[in-house]
A protein has these predicted regions:
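Extended, low-hydrophobicity, polar/charged segments
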Residues: 1-175
Length: 175
């Protein structure tokens, strides 16, 4: 499988993914996942896509949302196309049955996922988190996501995301 853009894509290599991602992929029966090293200074989506020749619509962002109700905090990961924005205060807040929902603080997201900020991916997240995927992501043939590290990316068939634990496909998760 050839990856998008002008990157040197190779089969997933342990040194190019965060430890929780490598562990999750060790149990995943997919052979068509690719990784590519990138300049960590270009990990943010717009800069990454422009520099490496990737269409924004072929890139998906994973954000960690914290929903709170009283003293209870629930987390979810949301995967949406880079051309859209997550509906945090509508769809996600209702799904988490929370009074308030917001992007998780950076330190919390990093500590809870074991991944680098700016590289968080839906692969290898805590088992009790829902992974909310906007249906538009699945309409892509191939999608580029984080690797858990800022210095690399993963490319995979979008439909492979359906194999993730805790995945829920949601229409209108993003707009």
């Amino acid at each position: 499988m050839k990856g998008p853009g002008n990157l040197d894509w190779t089969p997933v290599a342990a040194g190019l993914v965060a430890a929780p991602v490598a562990e999750a992929l060790g149990n995943w029966p997919r052979a068509d996942l690719l990784t590519a090293p990138i300049d960590p200074e270009l990990a943010d989506t717009a800069a990454f896509c422009e520099h490496y020749g990737i269409e924004l619509a072929d890139s998906a962002n994973c954000v960690v949302i914290a929903g709170r109700r009283g003293q209870d905090t629930r987390y979810a990961a949301c995967l949406v196309l880079a051309t859209t924005r997550t509906d945090v205060n509508g769809v996600v807040r209702r799904r988490l049955d929370a009074r308030k929902a917001s992007f998780a603080p950076m330190d919390d997201a990093v500590a809870l996922t074991g991944m680098e900020y700016g590289g968080i991916t839906p692969i290898g997240l805590p088992a009790d988190w829902p992974v909310l995927v906007d249906r538009a992501v699945l309409d892509r043939d191939l999608v580029v996501i984080g690797s858990g590290l800022r210095r690399s990316k993963i490319a995979l068939p979008a439909k492979a995301l359906l194999e993730l634990p805790g995945v829920e496909v949601i229409d209108g998760l993003a707009s």
